[in-house]
Amino acid sequence: VRVYKTVSFSVVILLIAVLFAGAVAVPAAAQSDAIQFHYNAQHAGDYSPVAGRNVSKGKLMWSFTTRSYVGSGPAVVNGVVYVGSDDHNVYALNATTGAELWSFTTRGYVGSSPAVVNGVVYVGSWDHSVYALNATTGAELWSFTTSGCVDSSPTFVNGVVYVGSLDHSVYALNATTGAFEWSFTTRGKVVSSPAVANGVVYVGSDDRNVYALNATSGAEVWTYTTGGQVFSSPAVANGVVYVGSDDSNVYALNATTGAKLWGFTTGYWVYSSPAVANGTVYVGSVDGNVYAIGNAAAATSQSATPGFDVMLALVGLVIAAYAVKTYRQ
């Protein structure tokens, strides 16, 4: 699936500006750590130090215009915004002014959200490659070529980069050298971004399955089959895997066994990647709603209808939603 955002990049920066309002959202101590899709390797999307900040005013600080759609989620580290664009570039921008610091050109769309760890930017491209770039200069450190487009966002854990590809595979790569460590082949495209917790990689595939894989060997630990394609990226919190499916459901699965704990049905496909904070699961649906789902057997929920298809990300208590159009490839 290719997801096209129908709003400008300046709107994305407006939402980032909300995080900066009144205080720096991510302290320097945290910024030296792994900053990646949905904040960390578990993809729960909850960064508690943001909670309680003054984020009531969404004042536009600046905007930066690329030459095409921006489907990549920005990563903000040490005063720099890293983001990809469908114009084939990865950009590094000054987080205060929006000035371009550098850009790196790939040979395809960059919808993958960068992971920035220890001075290295890891990102995928539709040119079939995963790139490691110097975070300061944008120089290429290494690249690894898969057999399909890479829309999945890389996840870094313990010196290994985990990422999916439209060639149906999940890859584990050495973060320093880019050397191949293992791959696991599903029966469909892997757009989902892997979540890693307690030595297990959790990822969805458009073969309708959610997979749990041994992070060291790639061996299958368990598989859970949903009723639709799984483009949603799993989130892991407190021993539970949360993930959406094209069957319109959000699932909570036991992280150890894969057993279904509960399911919550929305009105349409769930591409959105759930975020989990304070016992509540936040997720968007193509039915136009953003849902807050109580974690006790999904017994309680609230929804808000913004009037467009929803993709959602949550950091602390700040939710960012934006309109999307989709087509399947």
Where are the predicted features?
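Extracytoplasmic/lumenal domain signature
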Residues: 25-71, 75-302
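Secretory targeting signatures
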Residues: 1-37, 290, 295-329
